[in-house]
Amino acid sequence: MEKRLIIAVVLSIGVLYAYSFIFPTPKPVPTPGGKQAAMSSATAPAPSVAALPIAGTTPVAAPAPQAGQAPAVAKDVTVDTDLYTAVFSTQGGGLKKFVLKKYKETAGPQGKDIVLVNETAANRYALLSDSREFGISPNALYSASTGEVKVTDGGKGSLELTTTTSQGITFRKVYTFSGDAYRIGLTEEVQNVGNVALTGAVHLLQTSRVVDAKKEGRYEVYSPSTLAEGKVKLDDLEDLQKTPVQYGKDIAWSAFADKYFVDGIIADKGSISQVRITRPANDAILRDVASPTVSVAPGQRSAINYAIYYGPKDLDILKLQGSRFEEVIDYGWFGPIAKPLIYSLKFLYKYTGNYGIAIIIITFILKLVFFPLTHKSYKSMKDMQKLQPKMTELKEKFKNDRDAMNRAVMELYKTHKVNPLGGCLPMLVQIPVFFGLYRALMYSIELRHAPFYLWITDLSAKDPYYVTPIIMGATMFIQQKMTPTNMDPVQAKMMLMLPIVFTFMFLNFPSGLVIYWLVNNVLTIAQQMYINKTVE
């Protein structure tokens, strides 16, 4: 009996510890006020690359005219596609606004479009370029090839921004757009129109803003990440306030993601030689992406290519970007389980039109898959229950000799071919599936604002009235009452506390996950009724 209790307690503690370890409470992110979307990107002050600040901001004065240029006034260029609206500025050649058309801040028809970038100060624009060697300033004024770009369906469009530096360099930034893709091409071209050969690197400055947004879940986090040397490197926001992070080998991309959206710079044929990540202000993460060093002789030119991504953390869309960009979604250890579950949910959604129904179907399928293990588990518990009288006799017989009692109990197990752990081990196999599904539901953009029925309007958010977790706790209680046990009454009462513990744990879980666990419990009760009739 003690072994059963110890195993149950250890499993319960293990689940709670695993819960805390896998889903740690995120560190608070103090930021200035202002309600914005869950993730907003902008560019922090862009000083010279050799002396990037660790904290604080510095206002940027109005830029002086570049050599060979007449004074000019900065203008906006609007790019409109089926998926987003972007606004670029001729000051700095950067991005000042980016709005997603397919995603809303809140559920329902009144929800506003998600805004990923929205800056009014020129020193906060995204995608600014800087190079001390070539005289390229993040504050330079550019001439634009057009005042507006409109791309629909599968069409293509481009925007060319050009400036000339005092070092005799004509610098071009060419953005290319597709009407049906979030991917934006960026070519930075250095043309030497002077008389002296120049050597240097061009830095692309990309800051992602960390905003004090309303969290949709307790475990929503912000995280800069970089794929370098074949591994995804995650950086802690608080650590970045103290110490910058730098990567300089085999860099495929650098990104910043929140729960549902991401901005990233993806290398093209080794176009990123170094990434330096700092936190120049509480509300910003600065990524200084440096190109390889290039030498440009008089009359020659050199081009550096990138892919820019602003959009949803949709597994299929991210995979299309190449360079393992889909790994910007951090599923932790349960990625091999979470990804197939996401693809399965998407497949079922095509036929059901409701992700809640898709989750229920997935639950049925998983129950069928695990039926042999569950059946074996309950059969083992039944067998243990039958041996309870004999175990009580052995305990009484060898009450003064624990070693002899243990040997006798093990011999009893061997004689009746009973595995004392047979009731627990099959259950342990299902725990990774539970956590994998948790990750899939928590970070799947498809479930964001996806309704089920009645009061459940967002399967990625908690049940607003806590109805489903309470019912789930009740079914767990019924399930435990039906489960064979060889515990004494006191131990059994202790185990009945587990449904209460799990109910409180599930109160703030995504409603889609609670539906899975609730349906799973109902199916388990039906299965237990069947086993109780067939296994005697």
Curated annotation (Swiss-Prot):
GO molecular function terms attached to this record: membrane insertase activity
Transmembrane segments: 5-25, 353-373, 418-438, 495-515
GO biological process: protein insertion into membrane; protein transport
Database matches in CDD domains: 5TM_YidC_Alb3, EcYidC-like_peri
Top-rank taxon, per record: Bacteria
Cited HAMAP family: YidC_type1
UniProt xrefs under PANTHER family: CYTOCHROME C OXIDASE ASSEMBLY PROTEIN COX18, MITOCHONDRIAL, OXA1
Protein name per its UniProtKB record: Membrane protein insertase YidC
